[in-house]
Amino acid sequence: MLPVIVFGAALYPDGSPRPALLARVRAALGFGAQHSDSLYVLTGGVPQAGWTEADVMADLLLSAGVSEEAILREDGSADTCDSAIACTKLLRARGYGGPVAVVTSDFHMMRCVAMLRALGWITVSVPAPSRTDLSRRRRLWVHLREYPATVWDVLLVLTWRFRQ
């Protein structure tokens, strides 16, 4: 079994997926097509119109032919840090200690990988391309905010880890 952790992304208010979430699911499917033993670990518990990010991703994967047995939903987390910790708990409870594939937007990869490594995981990065239709200023902001967020989130997960 190879866990493929797919980090969620905000949904539209009607519960439909935004482009970032669709890109992440496409990247996960592409990776999973090359690894038949994939277990898709879907994160994101912020509901919109009764749907969580994990629910929407599961629906997309099921529609693409992935079996329900190959899907594990983590639908209780409110942010990236919560997701990393919750996935760690889920996988450790199942006795898993091997490497994990990490699927998220390219700009978000550094933070997700850093947190999971701080939690003791060996990671394989599966970046989803980010939108190209954003303004230059918005793209700069999206990338620059990841640096302080990475430092902060790694400190949070290390604090959690050492309190265990």
Which residue ranges define each predicted feature?
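A transmembrane-helix-recognition feature enriched in membrane-embedded lipid enzymes
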Residues: R136-R163
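A structural signal for short, hydrophobic/glycine-enriched beta-strand patches
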Residues: M1-L140
